[in-house]
Amino acid sequence: MNEPTRIPKYVKDKIRQAKQGDLYSSFTVSEYYYDGEVLERDIEQSELYLRNVSRIINNAKIRLRNISLYDYKKFSKLKFTSSEKNTTIIIGNNGSGKSTILESISKCLQFLSDNIRIQNNNNYKFQDSEINIHSISGQTIVRCILEIENDFSFSCSLTKNRENISRKVSSELEEFKALARMYQRSNELDNNTLSYPLLAYYPVERSVTLKRDDAVKYYERKKAKYSDKSEGLKNAFDGTSNFNDFFSWYKEIDDIINEFKANDSITKEEIEYLLSKTDNKEKIGSLISQLLEKKNNYNNNEDREFLIRQQKVIQESIKTFVSDIDQVKISRTPHLDMTVIKNGSEISIFNLSQGEKTLIALVSDIARRLVILNPSLENPLNGYGIVLIDEIDLHLHPKWQQTIVQKLENTFPNIQFILSTHSPLVLTTVTSEQIKIINELDYRFKLLSPTSNPFGKNASDALAIMETSESPLVHSEEILALIKKYESLVKRGQEDCRKTKEIKKTHRKHWIYI
């Protein structure tokens, strides 16, 4: 009789922590039982612990808590902590580093996303040029902390060392790789029905011109698999290709729905074939019933309803952002195109304004990915994730700038948005706690929140937060003071008084302003 294998103390500790509900320990114990190296192989026990993991992470809230940069690009040291609310907005002057912060976050999110798609993927992109030129250590470190359901933290540290340094620092990847394996293994356990988080970055380059020919060629080259969950993670950090992916995916769904509809009815050719078989009306009726039953059996009503629901979700999300668009459809004649019904008229989506196209491309891509990543949710737009958007105000009319954040939060209520902007109108739609200002003093950087709250205020209050005058700086402070003095005198009905005339006479060259 074999003696039972002695269980090491660290394994006992993991089992105890797993029974107390710790996510990481539950997955580790599941792996122990599955691998059979530390514990005796027991698939049933492995699945038992994995069920606990799946229960926690399926459609779980995921958030970026903070990211720390060391000698990354212009920042020798910087820590970004996200707002407790769903949206955080980074502001600063041109060249202050807004995009750099978003890029650093995207590197960590992309590493997690790539590992969910491909197990044990150690690849991440860093260039030597991303190391701060004044770095004494000769290395850059980007350290990120994510939270699941506010209870479980996972950290990742990405490092790039210069070739010529002797003391190199290693990346710390294991926790993110473990989190990715949790999603993979749980999805296998749940027969591909588990919800994956949406992780995506939309850089400024997303505003490239959308062309119908490019989208059609892309579709012909790559026909999307509408049910492939990995499609929801692919190219999520390359904003330039997203609309073509959406076009291809939407066209594939539309084709399948049309095929289902075609099988709901009997064609003229089928009727002529039945008539050629017999003149007996009762027999013809029986044959028609048999044919319809056969077609109905061919159609998978569950699949059809699922696809129609997906299509409707996309259309509703676009309509939320561009209210005068009633419908999005695929047109096949005289050529393949995507069209919209706008104010009662059908128009190619590629002929809309740049602002409309930029917004539709962004919204449709987020919605498409959520639909793919959340196959079991009644409303997939309620899926969780983290989305980064650089210059959210890009090409948007001021009216849209005032509503974009609210619409993003209402349409995608469980997404954490981290945005950058130059628009004071955007800032008037969030609280001071949601705003992070890049502050530099003697080459040291900090992210600060404004002391005044711009929410619901005038744009002038937001301009003050951005340290920008509400009046164009075309005059000296002295001239601006005189202009205000003149305006005050006129408003009091003293346009003919000596002081008013003196200002007018002395500063005649500024007559256009006073």
UniProtKB/Swiss-Prot annotation:
GO MF, one example: ATP hydrolysis activity
InterPro entries named among the record's database cross-references: AAA+_ATPase (IPR003593), ATPase_AAA_core (IPR003959), P-loop_NTPase (IPR027417)
Gene3D superfamilies reported for this sequence: P-loop containing nucleotide triphosphate hydrolases (3.40.50.300)
Chain segments annotated as coiled-coil in the UniProt record: none
Protein name: Retron Vc95 probable ATPase
Stated role: Probable ATPase component of antiviral defense system retron Vc95, composed of a non-coding RNA (ncRNA), a reverse transcriptase (RT), this protein and a putative HNH endonuclease. Expression of retron Vc95 confers protection against bacteriophages T2, T4 and T6. At multiplicity of infection (MOI) of 0.02 cultures slow growth when infected with T4 but do not collapse, at MOI 2 cultures enter growth stasis.
Organism field: Vibrio cholerae serotype O1 biovar El Tor
One GO term of the biological process aspect: defense response to virus
Domain of life: Bacteria
Motif (ATP-binding): 92-99
CDD domains for the chain: ABC_ATPase
Source lineage: Bacteria, Pseudomonadati, Pseudomonadota, Gammaproteobacteria, Vibrionales
The entry's keywords: Antiviral defense, ATP-binding, Nucleotide-binding
